[in-house]
């Protein structure tokens, strides 16, 4: 019997990026859902129970940090990968303190994100991963 595909929620207001990520993830056997701001993302996390979330930091209405703050420390929260165009190391440190499994700066190689997704689903954090995009 085939294993049920893992569900990934992408929360990002950049529709082109969301479609590119959707295509790549579906090609690798994942089921993909999407939300376009933090409010929609929070609702989808509660209602759809994704296995992993890819979360943008900067979005209209509600960005990624309030979502991270809301789910911080909750044992039933899915692993979250934050993606951002922000270069600040303080932002990365705060996101890590809030519990992200990885923090990836845009633009990024799709392979980099796919590796982070695979590690996140296995329960491994970015701390064990090679830091190839560390431009502090």
Place the predicted regions along the sequence by residue.
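Non-catalytic signal-transmission and effector/linker regions of two-component phosphorelay proteins
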Residues: 1-7, 111-136
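Charged docking surfaces used in two-component/phosphorelay signaling
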Residues: 19-27
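Acidic catalytic/metal-coordinating carboxylates
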Residues: 36-40, 62-67
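Short amphipathic alpha-helix used as the core "switch/output" element in two-component signaling
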Residues: 43, 65-76
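Active-site beta3 strand of CheY-like receiver
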Residues: 48-54
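Receiver (REC) domain active-site loop signature in two-component systems and cognate sites
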Residues: 59
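Alpha4 helix (beta4-alpha4-beta5 surface) of REC/receiver domains from two-component response regulators
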Residues: 66, 87-102, 115
């Amino acid at each position: 019997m085939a294993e049920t595909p893992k569900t990934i929620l992408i929360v990002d207001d950049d529709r082109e990026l969301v479609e590119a990520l959707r295509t790549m993830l579906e090609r690798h056997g994942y089921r993909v859902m999407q939300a376009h701001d933090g409010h929609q993302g929070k609702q989808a996390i509660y209602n759809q129970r994704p296995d992993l979330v890819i979360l943008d930091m900067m979005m209209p209405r509600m960005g990624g940090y309030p979502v991270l703050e809301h789910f911080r420390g909750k044992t039933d929260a899915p692993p979250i990968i934050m993606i951002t165009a922000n270069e600040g190391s303080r932002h990365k440190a705060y996101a890590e303190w809030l519990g992200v499994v990885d923090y990836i700066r845009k633009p990024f190689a799709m392979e980099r994100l796919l590796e982070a997704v695979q590690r996140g689903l296995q329960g491994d954090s970015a701390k064990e991963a090679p830091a190839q995009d560390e431009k502090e």
